[in-house]
């Protein structure tokens, strides 16, 4: 499929948080080589595939911590809607390549001592990190139908907000989370009672 998109106005949006490969390089005093600068730049997570596959649309890496991939998705949807690109790849990357990750999150009490996530449960004692890479191609629905593409889902609406001032910079705001849900529902022109499944933040 990608070979058919060469030279097209296709965007590339990649959500990522943390930079374990560079962290490991620095911790082990790896000798600097000519590829370290560009090779470790987060922007290259989006720019390299755009370069390699000759994609001409917007190309950017998004880091908004846990929401990175969904914010990348929101930006890609808006870019398609406003004509900045005709379609867009959206990817999410989370690879745990450094022990620093575990040491840090243990030090702030974020990791589950039981090794399990117990969301909305009295047993909740933190979260367990996981790894993965995923990528989807977004197209306007009418074009996907016309092209006979396999359609896995339809994005009806999305929204992005920041929690603003809370107890700490990492503490969520229940009030703002309610606002962003309402905004997403309004954008999608649906009612809350029409929702059949919600995937919540697991921390």
Regions from the PLM with identified roles:
Residues 1-203:
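Condensing-enzyme catalytic core of the thiolase-fold
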């Amino acid at each position: 499929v990608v070979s058919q998109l060469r030279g097209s106005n296709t965007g590339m949006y990649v959500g990522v948080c943390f930079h374990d490969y560079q962290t490991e390089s620095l911790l082990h005093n790896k000798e600097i080589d000519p590829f370290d600068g560009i090779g470790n730049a987060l922007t290259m997570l989006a720019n390299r595939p755009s370069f390699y596959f000759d994609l001409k649309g917007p190309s950017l890496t998004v880091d908004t911590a846990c929401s990175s991939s969904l914010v990348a998705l929101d930006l890609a949807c808006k870019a398609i809607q406003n004509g900045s690109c005709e379609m867009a790849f959206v990817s999410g990357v989370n690879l745990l390549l450094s022990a620093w990750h575990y040491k840090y999150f243990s030090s702030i009490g974020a990791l589950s001592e039981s090794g399990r996530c117990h969301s909305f449960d009295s047993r909740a004692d933190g979260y367990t990190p996981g790894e993965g890479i995923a990528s989807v191609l977004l197209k306007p629905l009418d074009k996907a139908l016309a092209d006979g593409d396999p359609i896995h889902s339809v994005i009806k609406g999305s929204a992005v907000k920041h929690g603003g001032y809370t107890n700490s910079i990492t503490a969520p705001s229940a009030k703002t989370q309610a606002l962003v849900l309402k905004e997403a529902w309004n954008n999608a022109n649906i009612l809350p009672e029409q929702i059949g499944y919600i995937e919540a933040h697991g921390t």
